[in-house]
């Protein structure tokens, strides 16, 4: 596993096994942040709720369903691009690559890149970052399919303490 340093931040580490661990803010920090942000945004003249609060487990599942609709083309376009790059990309990579993904979700597109990385190197390190607990499920699924994969995930927003 990588030397991900646990700075003096308010994260709890969960070690699932030698190939999977993830970090997540302590529950009290999440609850306090939610209460503060909702209170602040609903006390403004123009009331709103930050969309990040839509991405709980159910919200993430709903978004994954939306991405497979015929009307939602970005995911299909991205997959098409990645498939076209599948044969050319390895010539630009060396044998010591890590993969960091912001907004990993169910890691559907990630698999296309992992297919390349795992053929190039004996061990692949993957760092998914997602606001939702879906990260844990998708990481466990990836480990079933990629023996040489090691995952260190972060369940948080991009502006979380771990990214400062």
Question: What residue spans do the PLM features occupy?
Answer:
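Conserved SAM-binding loop
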Residues: 138-142
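Conserved class I S-adenosyl-L-methionine
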Residues: 96-105
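S-adenosyl-L-methionine
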Residues: 143-164
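N-terminal auxiliary segments of SAM/dcSAM-dependent transferases
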Residues: 2-52, 60
């Amino acid at each position: 596993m990588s030397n991900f340093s646990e700075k003096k931040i308010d994260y709890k580490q969960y070690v699932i096994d030698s190939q999977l661990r993830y970090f997540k803010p302590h529950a009290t920090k999440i609850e306090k942040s939610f209460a503060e942000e909702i209170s602040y945004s609903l006390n403004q003249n123009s009331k709103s709720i930050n969309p990040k609060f839509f991405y709980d487990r159910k919200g993430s599942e709903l978004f994954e369903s939306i991405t497979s609709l015929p009307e939602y083309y970005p995911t299909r376009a991205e997959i098409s691009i990645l498939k076209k790059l599948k044969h050319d990309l390895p010539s630009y990579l060396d044998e010591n690559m890590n993969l960091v993904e912001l907004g990993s979700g169910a890691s559907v597109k990630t698999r296309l890149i992992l297919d390349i990385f795992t053929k190039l190197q004996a061990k692949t390190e993957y760092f998914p970052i997602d606001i939702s607990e879906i990260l844990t499920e998708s990481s466990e699924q990836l480990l079933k399919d990629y023996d040489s994969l090691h995952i260190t995930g972060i369940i948080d927003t991009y502006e979380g303490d771990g990214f400062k």
